[in-house]
Structures are given as structure tokens and as C-alpha cells.
């Protein structure tokens, strides 16, 4: 399957990369001379390239095209005729202005799945507003629930709205491709960052609806589960996630406090939520006495979810199953001649 990636920055390129990770031929279309803006987002740099760019553009080929020129537009149309999926994230109407919108390209290739990613959707009063992840984290309420109580707003440490949007885009693309097997027809997909941000709030949004009150910032704590947070040990921080009553019944003996099981304030989770401050104070004294590794090992032995709070270098050493890298992130225009040759233009 061929994917035409005419997107830039994060949400679109990440979606296209996920399709590349699945083994599909992804052609990244970039402006001559500058390319994707993230190529200039640094430091840090790695082998002369932006680390940011490298993180979201593996398993792609790079083609430079000036989509504002008639020649570039014609080459793009040739590619679209031979592609299964197109991903773009220009302002609504941007691709139409170049004769490369859904209406034009679907006439050339009725099987094309055309995915447009924007901040606020293709229609409606906000469609022309500019959008970056930070703005959506703020507007969709994410920054109101992130950080410590009483502290200034904090953004999530990575661009989660962009990443959620990419996952929703891939989900819709794969669904459209499956539907195409039945109907023979492609589809226009309208994926917005705002919709993705609101949908991903899940239980926090439902909590607000249920209570009529906006949730506040709680640091690492959970609004509905106690204890479920970070704790300070003798030499650092770790987390414990007591997400059910059976886990609570294993947790208390494991930490040497079996009497908590019969304490009238802690018998069940609603009571523990109500008396959160009292329980946290008791646990803080206990956990301060031993190092992180001992607590994590002990809790894990008793089947209680627990983990150290790692920095990223430590996290990257954890056992995992990384995506297969068939192609490293391409240099700007690295595959232009190759792709043009495939089109019979060289």
C-alpha cells in the first residue's frame, strides 16, 4: 500500500510513520529547501539532524515538490493516482487552492482515502484558527488537570494531543481501507485535534459531567482511586497503583501495615478517597524508611503494580519491542530521483 504524506510537524507525520511501521510505502512530500519545519527544531541534533524530526519520520521516503507550482501539482496528482492513502494537515481549503483537494483527487482516484488533520475541523466557525498542541492542551482543559494543586498550569510533558490525533487518524484510515474492500470507494476523513483532545479526556470529562464541578490539579494522585500515586522513598520516588480491593488486601500486609485492612476509614475505596490525606500521611512515613528498589521489589512480589519514577535514559534501557526500522528518517529530498523515476519522469 502506498501512503502519500503531505503533512508537517507532528500529528500527520506520526500517523504516516505508524503506517510505515506496518510495512507500507510512505512518501513524505516536502517543500524544496526547507522541508518539514521540524527539521529546524533543535537543539538537540543527531548526525546533523533535528532529534525531533528523527523521532517521527522513520520508514519513509522523502520527495521534494513545490506544491505551489503547476509542475509540482501535476507530479503530486500522478502520485495520488497511484496511492491508497493521502494525509495532509494544511489549513482547510489549502489543498483545494492548489487543485489537490478531495474533490479533485477523488475524481482521479476514486479509491483514495484522503485524511485531513486540522486543529478544529474542516467546517464550523473555528475552522480557520491556527493550532498547535500547546493551544489545544489549554483549550481542551488538559492543563487544568495537570500539575500540583494551587500551582500554575502545566502542559503534559509530550505533545499528547498531537499523538492522540495521530492515533485517531490511523484508526479512521484503517477503517476506511477496510470499508473500501466492500464498497470499492475511498473516503474523505476529517480528523481534528480538538475532537481528539476532548474524546481522550474520557473519565475526567465524565467526572465533570457527573458532579457539575471541574476537576482540579492533583499531581500524581487519582481522583477516584486511593492510593494511586507517587511516593517518596529513602532515595527517590516510585509509584504504587492500588486499583482494586484485592490489590489493597495484598498491599497492606506487603508494606507491614495489615491493620489498615480493618481501619474504619480505609475499609473500601470510597472511604479511602474520603480520607485520602490521613492515609497518605501514614504511607509517607512508611515509604520514607526504605529505598525505591526494595519497595518496588516487595510490592511486585505481592502482585501490587509498582514502578520507579525513571528518567528517560533509564526508560530507554527497559526491555521492549521497538518498531522495525526498514528505512532511517530520510534526508530532505533523498528519494526524489528514485520516486520520479518510478513515475516515468526520469
Predicted regions: what is each one?
Residues 1-182, 331, 335-346:
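N-terminal helix-loop segment corresponding to the beta1-alpha1 unit
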Residues 1-2, 216, 232, 297, ...:
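Terminal low-complexity tails and localization/encapsulation signals of metabolic enzymes
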Residues 33, 120-121, 193-198, 235-237, ...:
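Glycine-rich beta-alpha junction loops
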Residues 36-38, 208-215:
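Short Pro/Gly-enriched beta-strand edge/turn motifs at strand-loop
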Residues 60, 184, 320-322:
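Glycine-centered positions within short beta-strands or beta-hairpins
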Residues 122, 150-159, 181-197, 216-223, ...:
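Conserved Rossmann-fold dehydrogenase catalytic segment
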Residues 166-186, 199-211, 252-258:
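Oxidoreductase and adenylate-handling cofactor-binding alpha/beta cores
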Residues 221, 226-302, 306:
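Aromatic-enriched alpha-helical interface/lid elements that frame and gate functional surfaces
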Amino acid at each position: 500500500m502506498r501512503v502519500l504524506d503531505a503533512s508537517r510537524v507532528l500529528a500527520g507525520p506520526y500517523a504516516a510513520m505508524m503506517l510505515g511501521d506496518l510495512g507500507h510505502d510512505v512518501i513524505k512530500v516536502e517543500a524544496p529547501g526547507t522541508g518539514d519545519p521540524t527539521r529546524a527544531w533543535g537543539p538537540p541534533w543527531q548526525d546533523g539532524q533535528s532529534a525531533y524530526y528523527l523521532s517521527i519520520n522513520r520508514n519513509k521516503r522523502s520527495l521534494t515538490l513545490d506544491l505551489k507550482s503547476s509542475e509540482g501539482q501535476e507530479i503530486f496528482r500522478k502520485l495520488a493516482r497511484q496511492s491508497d492513502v493521502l494525509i495532509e494537515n494544511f489549513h482547510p481549503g489549502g489543498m483545494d487552492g492548489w487543485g489537490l483537494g478531495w474533490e479533485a483527487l477523488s475524481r482521479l482516484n476514486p479509491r483514495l482515502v484522503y485524511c485531513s488533520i486540522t486543529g478544529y475541523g474542516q467546517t464550523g466557525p473555528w475552522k480557520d484558527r491556527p493550532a498547535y498542541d500547546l493551544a489545544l492542551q489549554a483549550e481542551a482543559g488538559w492543563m487544568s488537570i495537570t500539575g500540583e494543586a494551587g500551582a500554575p498550569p502545566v502542559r503534559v510533558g509530550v505533545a499528547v494531543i498531537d499523538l492522540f490525533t495521530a492515533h485517531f487518524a490511523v484508526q479512521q484510515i484503517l477503517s476506511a481501507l477496510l470499508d473500501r474492500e466492500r464498497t470499492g470507494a475511498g473516503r474523505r476523513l476529517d480528523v481534528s485535534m480538538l475532537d481528539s483532545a476532548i474524546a481522550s479526556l474520557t473519565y475526567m470529562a465524565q467526572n465533570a459531567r457527573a458532579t457539575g464541578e471541574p476537576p482540579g490539579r492533583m499531581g500524581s494522585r487519582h481522583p477516584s482511586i486511593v492510593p494511586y500515586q507517587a511516593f517518596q522513598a529513602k532515595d527517590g520516588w516510585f509509584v504504587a497503583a492500588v486499583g482494586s480491593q484485592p490489590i489493597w488486601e495484598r498491599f497492606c500486609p506487603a508494606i507491614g501495615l495489615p491493620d489498615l485492612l480493618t481501619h474504619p476509614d480505609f475499609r473500601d475505596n470510597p472511604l479511602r478517597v474520603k480520607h485520602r490525606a490521613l492515609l497518605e500521611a501514614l504511607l509517607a512515613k512508611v515509604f520514607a524508611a526504605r529505598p525505591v528498589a526494595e519497595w518496588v521489589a516487595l510490592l511486585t512480589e505481592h502482585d501490587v503494580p509498582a514502578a520507579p519514577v525513571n528518567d528517560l535514559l533509564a526508560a530507554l534501557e527497559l526491555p521492549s519491542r521497538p518498531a522495525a526500522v526498514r528505512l532511517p528518517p530520510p534526508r530532505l529530498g533523498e528519494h526524489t530521483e528514485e520516486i520520479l523515476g518510478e513515475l516515468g519522469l526520469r
